[in-house]
């Protein structure tokens, strides 16, 4: 009698790793850790620097990066160039501008013109880019009424004093509107590294 043909053995699939579930778990953990550090390491570093500076007896003046258009905030140790006439409604435009400094909103005033000067430093909606776009104003929440802000514009210094600080929704765009009197309005995303809220600081001009 002819023998029955043997069934071919099914090939076993082997994985290069003993347990793919563990590997995937480690990858997810690593990604989560990277995002966490990207979001919170820079703010934590800035906070530590601020606390050390607050307890230090030395009070060194801050040097503006230029005298053409820049900002100095002594209380939080912030200095930055200001990029003029940036469209605040086009994320591609303002995120590019924010890699160079604080953005001045297109259509708002300039120092000495008697209108609302609107400056902003957004966080990115992209978690991996968040710290790039908000570092200048990370510590803005420490500002209180009476703190001073200096703007340099066309080789002239302008001094402003904080009069108000507010936490608003991202849809609150009324602070971009012109005023009949000169006002300096600063805006950043809050908490740092997110786009959940907007922190607004308002200041009025005083003599320099």
Q: Which ranges hold each PLM region?
A:
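Solvent-exposed, non-transmembrane regions of membrane-associated and secreted proteins
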Residues: 16-19, 25-156, 160-208
């Amino acid at each position: 009698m002819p023998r029955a043909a043997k069934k071919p053995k099914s090939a076993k699939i082997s994985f290069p790793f003993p347990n793919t579930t563990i590997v995937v778990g480690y990858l997810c953990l690593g990604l989560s850790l990277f995002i966490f550090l990207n979001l919170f390491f820079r703010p934590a570093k800035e906070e530590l620097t601020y606390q050390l500076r607050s307890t230090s007896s030395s009070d060194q003046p801050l040097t503006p990066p230029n005298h053409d258009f820049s900002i100095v905030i002594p209380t939080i140790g912030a200095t930055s160039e200001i990029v003029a006439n940036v469209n605040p409604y086009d994320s591609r435009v303002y995120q590019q501008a924010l890699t160079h400094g604080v953005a001045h909103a297109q259509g708002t005033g300039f120092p000495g013109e008697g209108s609302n000067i609107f400056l902003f430093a957004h966080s990115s909606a992209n978690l991996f880019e968040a710290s790039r776009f908000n570092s200048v104003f990370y510590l803005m929440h420490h500002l209180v009424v009476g703190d001073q802000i200096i703007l340099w514009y066309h080789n002239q210094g302008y001094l402003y004093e904080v009069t108000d600080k507010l936490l608003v929704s991202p849809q609150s765009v009324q602070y971009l509107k012109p005023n009949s009197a000169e006002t300096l309005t600063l805006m950043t995303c809050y908490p740092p590294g997110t786009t959940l809220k907007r922190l607004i600081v308002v200041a009025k001009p005083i003599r320099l």
